Regions:
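Hydrophobic faces of well-ordered beta-strands that scaffold small-molecule active sites
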Residues: 3-9, 34-36, 64-68, 103-105, ...
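Active-site acidic/histidine proton-transfer and metal-coordination neighborhood
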Residues: 59, 75-189
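Active-site beta-loop-alpha junctions enriched in small/polar residues
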Residues: 8-12, 37-41, 69-73, 108-110, ...
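Intrinsically disordered, polybasic Lys/Arg-rich low-complexity tracts
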Residues: 341, 345-363
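Acidic (Asp/Glu)-rich catalytic clusters
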Residues: 23-28, 45-65, 92-97, 132-135, ...
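C-terminal helical cap(s) of enzyme catalytic domains, especially alpha/beta-barrels
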Residues: 278-293
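N-terminal pre-domain/capping segments
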Residues: 1-93, 187, 297-338, 357-362, ...
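Gly/Pro-rich active-site loop or hairpin
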Residues: 16, 114-117, 170-173, 196-267
Length: 381
């Protein structure tokens, strides 16, 4: 099982704001990846920073990724499509410079195509051209790329097609899978918050995640997954905005449980889209560690049960049944105990005793400055 976690952008806690400084902080936190959000044209003042990030990623075995323009209209008019492709070209150039492993792109509104085969075919044709452009950039015969050693020895960035979070945008899970299935060099970017929102809050249990990843694996035959995760506020099947994970009905614990218990075959990159960025990335890492700890505890119990069964000649199933019965009895006992605990105390008698004790002479009262009586209110905590 391979799981890499990181934030979408420079960490909030980073004192500097450059990509390289962000990478340093991410590595110090024990995270292993990052998704750069800078998609501007590579100008002289940016080149040095991007190149340094690429060198660091190459030397530190750090997975660098990049996110393309958030606003794209690949299904729009010729002018809108041309404008979007120009922005994507800048992203592809930046991806080469920073040694990005994945390039995440959006498609945009359905436009005049509407839902259906025509829209999917148009998207597939556009992304085929984008994949070809990435290969052209990576294998430019006119330049040996002496400052980009990862280009000569590596493979081009993979184009990620992200699932959208709104009904009016192209990018349902089924649409993305269909296009990826037909365009080599592309992968689905599973934005869990978007899938959860479009499904009216569908991602609730570890079984839900099992069905999701099995569906993708069976559809396109991959074990490599690139995912975004965050909390999300959603209404009527549409994502409204991202939230921190703890303030959403989209919980990370079921995904952590699936990854640990049933996701041994996964090679997964998880990017935190949360407003808390690296803080929620660390929260996800902690939940995965907790799931691993629970798994170890369960296996230890099973080992002890098998050893005891061998010693006593009892079946493992019988021992497990007895443990469950004992646990049930303990639970029932804990529930019944509070009903038996409150017993009426003879408070009036105690008060009378106090009155009787207070009847001796005034001299006695003055001598007993410190009272060690068990009923002294000052001794009640």
């Amino acid at each position: 099982m391979g799981v890499k976690l990181g934030p979408a952008g420079v960490p909030l806690s980073c004192k500097g704001r450059t990509i390289v400084e962000g990478m340093d902080d991410i590595i110090a936190l024990g995270l292993e990846t990052m998704e750069a959000q800078t998609v501007r044209l590579i100008q002289p003042q940016h080149f040095e920073q991007y190149w340094q990030a690429g060198v660091l990623a190459n030397k530190a075995d750090f997975e660098m990724n990049i996110h393309g323009p958030y606003y794209s209209e690949l299904l729009g008019s010729r002018v809108e499509r041309g404008r979007s492709l120009a922005k994507i070209e800048a992203t592809l150039q930046a991806a080469r410079t920073i040694n990005a492993r994945h390039i995440t792109l959006h498609t945009g509104h359905y436009g005049d195509f509407g839902r259906g085969t025509a829209a999917n075919e148009q998207v597939a044709n556009i992304f085929s051209d984008i994949v070809q452009r990435v290969h052209d950039i990576w294998h430019d015969d006119e330049d040996d790329f002496p400052v980009f050693p990862w280009i000569k020895d590596g493979t081009p960035s993979k184009i990620g097609i992200e699932t959208s979070g709104r009904q009016e945008l192209w990018g349902s899970l089924e649409e993305v899978i269909e296009v990826v299935n037909h365009v080599e060099g592309t992968i689905p970017v599973l934005n869990i918050a978007h899938i959860h929102a479009r499904g009216h809050g569908r991602m609730k249990t570890s079984e839900d995640y099992g069905e999701l990843f099995d569906f993708v694996r069976e559809s396109i035959g991959t074990k490599e997954f690139y995912c975004h995760f965050s909390g999300v506020e959603h209404r009527t099947g549409n994502a409204m905005h991202y939230t921190q994970i703890k303030k959403s009905d989209l919980n990370f614990e079921p995904l952590a449980e699936f990854i640990v218990e049933d996701g041994g075959w996964l090679d997964i990159t998880l990017i935190s889209d949360s407003p808390l960025l690296e803080h929620d990335a660390m929260y996800m890492l902690q939940n995965i560690d907790k799931a691993k700890h629970k798994q170890l505890e369960r296996k230890a119990r099973e080992d002890r049960r098998r050893a005891l069964a061998a010693q006593t000649g009892t079946s493992v199933e019988d021992l497990q049944r007895r443990e469950e019965e004992m646990a049930k009895l303990r639970t029932q006992g804990d529930k019944e105990a509070p009903a038996e605990e409150p017993k009426p105390e003879p408070e009036p008698v105690k008060k009378e005793e106090k009155v009787k004790k207070a009847s001796p002479s005034k001299k006695k009262e003055e001598d007993d400055v410190f009272s060690f009586d068990e009923e002294d209110d000052d001794d009640l905590f």
